[in-house]
Amino acid sequence: MPHSFGLRARTRYLFSRGFRNHGLLQTTTFLRTFRLGDYVDIKATGNVHKGMPHKFYHGRTGRVWNVTPRAVGVIINKRVGPRIIAKKIHVRTEHVKPSNSMAAHLKRIQENKKAVVEAKKAGKWVDVRRNPAAPKDGFFVNPRNTEFVEVKPVKYELLL
């Protein structure tokens, strides 16, 4: 049991770089543009020590509330006891990447807009709400065309 409680205690594997991912970072890491309201995933990059988030925030998703030349301000919900607190932290862009959590939602919004525009042109109304899957339709099994399989338990044999 470890007895040190430092800022990066127990992060030997958490902050380590992946297999064949060591060395210099790709230039896209620095050239990304973050805008206010973007959803981002915080993933600490071990070989950049500046602006590294606390280990609690590693793997969390938050929303950008501030953009500075080298860092991004992110709001993250943190559970403290029975309540959830919105924490504001600044993280360097090396430790942040755009999140795909909203991709399906944004795709659905675009499809809905397209469907509504086409329906208006045709003079119709289209329902864009999501509905749960309906039960499957019933059908009759024809015994003449069906091959039956008899299922039996395997006979137990004592092997010594």
Curated annotation (Swiss-Prot):
Alphabetized UniProt keyword annotations: Ribonucleoprotein, Ribosomal protein
Biological process per Gene Ontology, one example term: response to bacterium
One GO CC term on file: extracellular matrix
One term of GO molecular function: structural constituent of ribosome
Pfam family of the protein (one): Ribosomal_L21e
Similarity field: Belongs to the eukaryotic ribosomal protein eL21 family.
Protein name per its UniProtKB record: Large ribosomal subunit protein eL21
Organism: Dictyostelium discoideum (Social amoeba)
Gene name of the record: rpl21
